[in-house]
């Protein structure tokens, strides 16, 4: 069984905010050392940032509002630990953050990705899609179930009923859905 979430899922929103904060660090210096964790939901965005860059909280808050809408923000910026920072100087990267990927997708994963992109192109709201062999479960917010049933007649669509989704009803955190 595989699962895919779309760009409006709260975990993906948290990832986009973290990415924007990293971009701000790169705008300040050539090779910043930075680690960002974001937790977002229910009208609040919490971000903890460990960095060598001199970041402006107002710019971070502006990025949060651009990506997720106006909400309360709790931004903590601290200097990166000097030992971690020193470990990052040369070719060997020995920090505590990293994402490694690079495996080929299975046919089932490719099909689910195609379905997820198709649905998100029509309904750009929070959604999750699960495929288990030939069984397809579509959980899509802010859409009439009957409308999706016309497109994917063999799928189980919103098996728990219609729902709203997004960060007003769910919480997202960085690096949970990659």
Where are these regions (language model features)?
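Conserved active-site and cofactor/substrate-binding residues in soluble primary-metabolism enzymes
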Residues: 12, 16, 55, 59, ...
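N-terminal, positively charged regions that mediate nucleic acid binding
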Residues: 1-33
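Short glycine-rich or small-residue beta-strand-to-loop segments that form or flank ligand, phosphate
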Residues: 2-8, 37, 44-52, 98-102, ...
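Short, flexible coil/linker segments at or flanking structured domains
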Residues: 1, 35, 166-168
């Amino acid at each position: 069984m595989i699962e895919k979430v779309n760009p409006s899922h709260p975990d993906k929103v948290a990832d986009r905010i973290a990415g924007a904060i990293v971009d701000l660090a790169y705008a300040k210096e050539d090779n910043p050392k930075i680690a960002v964790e974001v937790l977002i939901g229910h009208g609040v965005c919490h971000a903890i940032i460990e960095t060598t860059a001199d970041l402006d909280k107002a710019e971070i808050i502006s990025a949060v509002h651009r990506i997720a809408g106006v909400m309360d923000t709790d931004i903590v910026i601290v200097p990166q630990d000097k030992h971690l920072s020193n470990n990052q100087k040369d070719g060997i990267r020995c920090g505590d953050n990293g994402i490694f990927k690079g495996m080929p997708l299975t046919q089932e994963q490719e099909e689910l990705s195609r379905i997820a992109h198709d649905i998100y192109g029509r309904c750009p709201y929070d959604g999750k899609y699960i495929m288990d062999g030939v069984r397809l479960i579509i959980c899509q917010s802010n859409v009439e179930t009957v409308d999706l049933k016309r497109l994917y007649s063999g799928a189980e669509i919103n098996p728990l009923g219609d729902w709203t989704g997004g960060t007003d009803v769910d919480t997202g955190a960085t690096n949970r859905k990659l």
